[in-house]
Amino acid sequence: METATIFSIFFSCLLIGLTGYSLYTSFGNASSELRDPFEEHED
């Protein structure tokens, strides 16, 4: 395989993994532990 092909596959997998992790953190089970700074400082 060429170096560019390996790099593009690696970069694509990395991007998909980070997107999946961020979606899981935002909407998954861990989202109940996130704090909302706007809700804490209501005036």
From Swiss-Prot:
GO terms for biological process: photosynthesis. The keyword Iron does not apply. The keyword Amino-acid biosynthesis does not apply. PANTHER family: PROTEIN PSBN. The chain crosses the membrane at residues 5-27. Signal peptide: none annotated. It comes from the Eukaryota. It holds the Pfam family PsbN. May play a role in photosystem I and II biogenesis. It is found in: Plastid, Chloroplast thylakoid membrane. Belongs to the PsbN family. GO terms for cellular component: chloroplast thylakoid membrane. Keywords: Chloroplast, Membrane, Plastid, Thylakoid, Transmembrane, Transmembrane helix. It is a single-pass membrane protein. InterPro entries: PSII_PsbN. This is Protein PsbN.
